[in-house]
Amino acid sequence: MKEFDYIEIRVPAKPQFVSVIRLTVSGLASRIGFNYDDIEDLKIAASEAVTNVVHHAYKKDGEGEIVIGCALYDNKMELMIADYGNSFNFEEIKTKIGPYHPEENIAGLREGGLGLYLMETLMDEVMINNDGGVTVFMTKYVTREQVEKNVERITT
C-alpha cells in the first residue's frame, strides 16, 4: 500500500500563477482533513514561497519555472517549492526575518521581508536548500480534535 500520494505542478515564475498554487494547495489540504485555519496557513506559506521565487529567483533571465511538489499523507502535507534561479545565504537572511528587531527604530520598519518569517511561523517544519537554486521544504501536520475521540468518557 502506498504511504503517500505525490502531486507535482510546474508553473511559470509569474505573479498570475500564485493564486493557482494557493487554490491547488487548498484543495489538496481539504482532502486530507485539515481544518479551515490550517488550510489558510498552508495557503499563505505556499504563496509566500512562490512569491519569493517570482520576485527573486530569475532576476537576470527574467523567465523561469517554479516546481511545486505536494506529498499527501494521512496525518500531514509536505510542500516543496523549488526554482533554478539565484540562491541566497539562508543563515544571513534568517537573521533579518521578522517584522522588526527590538534594537531598530520604529520609523525604520521596512516593507516586505516577512515571507520566511511567515513560513516558519505558520508551518510545523521548514527547511531550505540553496544549492543550485532554492528549494523550500515545508511540513504541516493535521490537527485532530482530542475531545471527539474521548467524548463518551467526559463528564461534567
For the regions a language model picked out, list residue spans one by one.
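Conserved ATP-binding N-box helix of the HATPase_c
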Residues: 36-61
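Conserved beta-strand-loop-beta-strand hairpin that lines the nucleotide-binding pocket
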Residues: 1-8, 54-156
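Bergerat-fold GHKL ATPase/HATPase_c domain
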Residues: 1-44, 148-156
